[in-house]
Amino acid sequence: MMREVQILLVVISCVIASACLEEGIEEAFDLSPPELVSWEAVSEEEILITFTEEVKASPDDFFLPQGKTLTSLTVEGEDLRLTISPPSLPGEPLPLEGRVRDRVGNSLTFFLVVYGYNERVPEVLINEFTTQGSSSHPDCVELYLVTEGNIGGLVFYEGTDTDWDQMFVFPPLDLPAGSFVILHTKPDGIPGEIDETTDPAASGGKDSHPSAWDFWLPDGKGLSGNNGVLTLYTRPGGRLLDAVVYSTGTSERYEGFAQKKVLDRVREVEDLGGWKGASSPLTPDDCIDPDPSTATRSICRASVPQDTDTKEDWHIVTTGGATFGGPNSDEVYTP
């Protein structure tokens, strides 16, 4: 019996030694640093950063802008929680530089921007847009607030959150339901083009509206004329709020969407449930046809917007019928 016990102990010792050896070999050949998975503000003061593996860090590893202080740091496996003071405003950009290490000492230095926590995200629709702008009426996108809230941190993409040509993050701004916001996507770059956060009549510039809130896309080039995806998210890396897909369907390339990037974006929005059609996967026939539109024949929803995430929500108004900053026209252009 004693001999059997001795043999069992030897076997257990060998198993433990083997496991330790394998772990040691694994650590010896682990040369990869942790990678960022996600980051977001989870409250006005707390930031959550997630990595691909367990990490270690100390307060001295982080650098914040002047006026911001790191008051606490908590490491929970792959998650890192930072408490920042004073609290950030909704959508306020916070540049953050930091460094973390894994259990064998591989380190990652990173720089990212976290947008202030917004607990009052409104329901917002992309409500009107033009893709065939002119020198006197450049391309614009209008947003309509279905409910009241703060648009701080909301982000518009020409594209999607993972692949885009142009983007704009809105600053903190409390607005009532029924408000209109205009994003001018091809500004002239003149001093009068002011992002309005206190006075809706403050901005000049082409097609600015005295009672809507005007914003100007820096270095904006306008929108793609024939094929494109427009999206609105709660924040960079956040939840999809609204999407629009348009295509003339005249191209023979990439299933009618002309470019691979557009096709990929269409598929991404479809997977998120942001756009629907009779076909699956979506084809250009399921999308808005922008071909009859012009700089003043905008593509818009009804005056009382409907949102079924289909092309049936949309029409092209008659010539001169664009109404950026006010209720949409229900007149329909007939070629």
What are these regions (language model features)?
Residues 1-8:
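Bacterial N-terminal signal peptides that target proteins for export
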Residues 16-19:
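C-terminal motif of bacterial Sec signal peptides marking the signal peptidase cleavage site
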Residues 21-30, 40-42, 107-164, 219-226, ...:
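A structural motif detector for short, solvent-exposed N-terminal "entry" segments of globular domains
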Residues 52-72, 154:
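Short, surface-exposed alpha-helix to beta-strand junction/turn motifs within ectodomains of secreted
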Residues 78-82, 181:
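Short strand-edge motifs at loop-to-beta-strand transitions and within beta-strands
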Residues 87-90, 172, 177-335:
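Solvent-exposed beta-edge/loop recognition patches
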Residues 100-106:
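Short, solvent-exposed loop/turn segments at the edges of extracellular beta-sandwich modules
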